[in-house]
Amino acid sequence: MSAALNDLLADLTRRMDGAIESLRRDLSGLRSGRASPNLLEPVRVEAYGSEVPLSQVGSIAVPEARMLTVSVWDRTVVGAVERAIRDSGLGLNPSTDGQTVRVPIPALTEERRNELARAASRYAENGKISVRGVRRDGMEQTKALEKKSEISQDDMKTWTDAIQKLTDQYIKKVDDIFADKEREIKQV
């Protein structure tokens, strides 16, 4: 393989890794039956005159499988933290215990599990679309090089095969990540 092909594949790999990371971030926001600090990541608290991420006003811990605790550093914002979690749309009902906000994670209903699985499926499909978009860019670059006679038709075939192989690997990664998340969501 030529250095130019290696450079192109390295660039495409970097961009496809970005699509995978984006998918993982999106899926981490979906609530499964287990407690996870990532669950509270999107929560923003009205504190100190502006909205700040929950992680900037306290530390999040998982003392039990179905319980999160937020140890708030400044007692003046404990009420705001509790309110922000309650109003977050995550279906959580926190309670305050001194400077600690306890957040029990309720069991998911079958209907809610199915909704979350559909949302995970949409995220996975968006991940595949991103990977395919990167592949399309790589194919266009390859065709442009062939058109300018910088690579031969044989080289173009080698390059497109390498790009397709890389794409297939990343599509499989997306499918595997989705399958794991779906299994986690469906687990009672």
UniProtKB/Swiss-Prot annotation:
The keyword Cell inner membrane does not apply. The keyword Cytoplasm applies. Its main location: cytoplasm. Keywords: Cytoplasm, Protein biosynthesis. One of its GO terms (molecular function) is ribosomal large subunit binding. GO terms for cellular component: cytosol. GO terms for biological process: cytoplasmic translational termination. InterPro entries: Ribosome_recyc_fac, Ribosome_recyc_fac_dom, RRF_sf. It comes from the Bacteria. It is found in: Cytoplasm. Belongs to the RRF family. Responsible for the release of ribosomes from messenger RNA at the termination of protein biosynthesis. May increase the efficiency of translation by recycling ribosomes from one round of translation to another. PANTHER family: MITOCHONDRIAL RIBOSOME RECYCLING FACTOR PSEUDO 1, RIBOSOME RECYCLING FACTOR. This is Ribosome-recycling factor. It comes from Gluconobacter oxydans (strain 621H) (Gluconobacter suboxydans).
